[in-house]
């Protein structure tokens, strides 16, 4: 499966568009950035987790790209330069926000089940004809929730390497740190997320306390259920361990259409409620 964050672009054509855009050709600039608009938004959305914030940041990023296009010298891939601007916009934003608790999702689920009007609203949303519960989109949602418990720098490291599939060298350059520093930061981020998933996720651990994926599928009803996923599985021939399970989860995440898929409205509401609760706690 191709990476959701990598549009089909011919490098030679992109290079020509860059050159024309650097000489003030606005049409060329539009053609240059348009294939990246959806991947950029997806990355920003998963970093900041609120749609309105992501839309605002995307516009800011595109303005910065336009203002600085002449500074791009081709030392790195255009994708790296582009996502570098987006990354630092996200980091600036996230540094003004509280980090989320690892158990934030579970607390949100308890709040919903304890308030009949919230549960009724969720059931109504999930019963709409256009709604299909895609469990992979929820896994991507969960991944971003757990990532929000990391420092902004760790969150960016794991997103750049594991979801956008930049090399360690490219990701380190984007974050303006040495490669050893980046690798250490990524290792810490993966370790923290692995511990969190192992303790929470019933898809990889039968003693995991979070059955939200299965619970939401049950609420959706037979007509609105997508494909089931009993557990996250590693590829044949690969040993099952926390590292390989994390890699298998990341593969699902990078190809899930969280931003505009059929569960979009539901996850927007979940993110809004989580952000409100986590920002307001003392």
Give the predicted meaning of each segment.
Residues 161:
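His-Asp-centered metal-binding catalytic motifs of divalent-metal-dependent phosphohydrolases/nucleases
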């Amino acid at each position: 499966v191709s990476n959701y964050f990598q549009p089909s672009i011919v490098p030679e054509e992109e290079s020509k568009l860059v050159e024309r855009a650097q000489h003030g050709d606005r049409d060329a600039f539009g053609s240059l950035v348009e294939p990246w608009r959806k991947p950029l938004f997806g990355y920003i959305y998963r970093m900041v987790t609120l749609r309105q914030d992501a839309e605002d940041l995307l516009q800011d990023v595109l303005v910065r790209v336009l203002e600085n296009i002449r500074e791009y010298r081709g030392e790195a891939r255009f994708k790296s330069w582009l996502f570098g601007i987006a990354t630092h916009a996200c980091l600036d934003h996230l540094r003004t926000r509280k980090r989320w608790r690892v158990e934030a999702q579970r607390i949100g689920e308890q709040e919903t089940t304890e308030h009949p009007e919230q549960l009724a609203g969720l059931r109504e949303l999930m019963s709409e004809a256009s709604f299909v519960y895609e469990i992979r989109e929820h896994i991507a949602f969960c991944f971003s929730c757990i990532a929000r418990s990391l420092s902004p720098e760790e969150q960016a490291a794991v997103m750049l390497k594991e979801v956008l599939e930049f090399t360690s060298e490219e990701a380190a350059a984007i974050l303006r740190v040495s490669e050893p520093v980046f690798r250490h930061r990524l290792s810490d981020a993966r370790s923290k997320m692995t511990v969190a998933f192992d303790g929470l996720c019933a898809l990889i651990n039968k003693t995991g306390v979070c059955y939200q994926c299965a619970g939401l599928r049950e609420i959706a009803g037979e007509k609105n259920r997508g494909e089931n996923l009993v557990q996250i599985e590693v590829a044949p021939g690969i040993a099952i361990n926390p590292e390989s399970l994390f890699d298998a989860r990341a593969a699902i995440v990078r190809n899930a259409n969280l931003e505009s898929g059929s569960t979009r409205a539901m996850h927007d509401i979940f993110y809004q409620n989580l952000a409100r609760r986590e920002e307001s706690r003392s």
